[in-house]
């Protein structure tokens, strides 16, 4: 097998991706598929960090839109990401993989607090390190958390797991004629509002030169393909 193109990655998993075909909760088949794929990547001596969202359980923006205090709604969303992180940790450990969950909000009974140097040490020891609770601050998305953690741990790429095989100029589910992009630069993403990630996250990636690969999570084996440098999905960079 060819050598991996990237040696340290951040995999961004949305809560919706963990829900699979459901609208709420966690799909065990999806969870186990992700775990198998991550183990496959780690066996190639790639260091894997994962940032999880919480939209399958609670979305802070949705709560705010219904009149809830935005900060409170966002903190609830951060707690939802911890639930997802623990579920993913369990799935990975059932595959025999060493893991650590690190939360931006301290809850020492269930996971470690996020400490940058400790996170890097876990990665160097071959442990899959799962970052939960976003940035720990309201008003920031888990996409921004993925960009921030990538910069902090000096990850070489962010793999954005989606339910579609890349970035399109329109929703491919609603518009079969939507055009798929194989490659974009950060300015395209920011100026055209293509939905890769929010503008704060995209700007952070641009400022720190962190490339993004948007790919289809539903096809098993795609995480490894992206790590090996195969042309899948959409590449966003300079």
Curated annotation (Swiss-Prot):
NCBIfam families, per database record: pyrH_bact
An annotated Gene Ontology molecular function: ATP binding
UniProt keyword Cytoplasm, yes or no: yes
Protein name as catalogued: Uridylate kinase
Bilayer-spanning residue ranges: none
Location(s), subcellular: Cytoplasm
An annotated GO BP: UDP biosynthetic process
Coiled coil spans: none
Protein family according to the UniProt entry: Belongs to the UMP kinase family.
Keywords tagged on the record: ATP-binding, Cytoplasm, Kinase, Nucleotide-binding, Pyrimidine biosynthesis, Transferase
Catalyzed reactions per annotation: UMP + ATP = UDP + ADP
Activity regulation comment: Inhibited by UTP.
Residues annotated as binding ATP: 12-15, 55, 59, 168, 171
Subunit description: Homohexamer.
Pathway field: Pyrimidine metabolism; CTP biosynthesis via de novo pathway; UDP from UMP (UMPK route): step 1/1
EC number(s) per entry: 2.7.4.22
Top enzyme class: transferase
Lineage: Bacteria, Bacillati, Bacillota, Clostridia, Eubacteriales
Record SUPFAM superfamilies: Carbamate kinase-like (SSF53633)
UniProt function note: Catalyzes the reversible phosphorylation of UMP to UDP.
Residues binding UMP, per UniProt: 54, 74, 135-142
One annotated Gene Ontology cellular component of this protein: cytoplasm
